[in-house]
Amino acid sequence: IHGREAPPVMVADFTFCHEDADYAHNQAEQYLATYLQSLLEHYELMGDHLGKTKGYTGYGKQAEVLRHIGFERYVEGFLASNAYGTPQQMLDKFKARYDIIGSFELATCFRFGGIPYEEAESSMRLFARQVLPELKSWA
């Protein structure tokens, strides 16, 4: 349309990087669930009012799906779509994504759902040391 190729898509990930895979999974699950619960409550996304509000019917349809699948499955799906784990697990996740959509820009969120600052910083530093250099080499 604009006479040039579209830039890579921007992908946002709620990220938790740790050397211990089980610990990374447990932390990501706990804090993503906390984040998602606050999001649902703040925006009242589980109610049926959105489907009746002009301009918000799309959100109403999403809320209907959320009510149908339940909070646990919502968290599972959200968790599956974000990158967390050991540095290698994260690279594997990013590689699988790259194989599907090609190049992408990455916006990472290391602090969400009440993760303590120290843990978020440790996760970010490990990601910067062991994941980011490899991601940069793909560009």
Model regions and ranges:
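Intrinsic disorder/low-structure terminal segments
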Residues: 55-58, 111, 126
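C-terminal helical cap(s) of enzyme catalytic domains, especially alpha/beta-barrels
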Residues: 116-136
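An alpha-helical appendage that flanks or caps ligand/catalytic pockets
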Residues: 1-103, 136-139
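Outer-membrane beta-barrel pore domains
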Residues: 78-86, 108-110, 115-119
